Amino acid sequence: MNENVIKAALLGFGTVGTGVYKVLKNQEKEMSAKIGCKVEIKKILVRNIEKAAAKIEDASLLTSQWDEIINDPEIEIVIELMGGINPAKEYILSALKAGKHVVSANKDLIAVHGHELLDAAHESKVDFLFEAAVAGGIPIIRPLKQCLAGNHMTEVMGIVNGTTNFILTKMTQEGMEFKDALALATELGYAEADPTADIEGLDAGRKVAILASVSFNSRVLFNDVYTEGIAKITSKDIHYAKEMGRDIKLLGVARNEADGIEAYVCPMLIPSSHPLATVNDSYNAVFVHGDAVEDAMFFGRGAGELPTASAVVGDVFDIVRNILAGCCGRIGCTCYKNIPVKKMEDTHNRYFLRLKVEDRCGVLAEMTAIFAKYQVSVAQIIQKDTKVEGCAEVVVITEKVREGDFRTAIEELRNRDSVRKISTIIRVYGK
């Protein structure tokens, strides 16, 4: 190692890779003053050199050969921004085993194989950092691992997908229906050409797996997280929620309960007074609860070229400081517990239910009898003025109930002739 320069390699030169390169170049002098060392990008791994060359002044940095990076002893830090599982996993593992430090923003990989990568880093006494894998520019992984380490964390939840938050904001503030808000999000570049991972909650689910693992010191994999998207939410649901003093947000939730971890992503009604209800457009926020700190919230841009690059470069700085201090590998995998993850049917929530029933006497009594049969306590029943073709629209809010019991009650309701349609079921956050 040159005492004034630490050399790094970028894997991938897309939106985030370009942002990281810009930040390191534009802030070169100030960063050198901050950490007492210059960080220099020596190589950038790309698939198409000709295409990438249009985005950089010095095309000699570009390579399509991984061997040029893994076999270069001068390269001490590998910054993986390729995305996906393979070949990213192969490259990261080989870099760690070769004694190189790694920074990654790859939530898809970390949500499934993060523990294997952290174990490999521990064995080689190097750092593997991934702040940018969750909520882009918002610092949350480092605070959970360091600043909040003295807490017993019982809950971490938040808005961790900017696309769906933008869509729900437009539906709430402008009365748009889902398909129109999605079209606008696509037009403005917030949604991908294939928005499935966002609108079905898969992107948020990966982030919840990572947050739960770090918060509760126990391994939670992506497959452990229940996911449900926002495609069925209507402007009518949002209107009714507003009448009740609530907003609808796609929330990622992880709770550390006495009988196991609850981890899920779904639309939820939250009180309009809750801090998360004020998080709009493409912004993200993560809300945590610990026994000592009590409630804390982290807010900011959850995606984008420079916000994500900010988190990546922050990890690079941490590694450089560790290298200079000779204390690499200080904080590896913190999942020293083995807490079971509960199945969704064993979780407990309140529910918002909107349905159409026959407009006649006795129907509401039939409904409440079915709910009572399955230990579903009803907090509120509201019959709306809307009446179409002999049907009345009814909104039900339940007390907290085991999801499996609630589902069974719903199936019996579906089979009743008096229940014409169950339009919406949304979980309700809070007591």
Task: Please tell me what each predicted stretch does.
Residues 180-278, 283-285:
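Substrate-binding/catalytic subdomain of NAD(P)-dependent oxidoreductase enzymes
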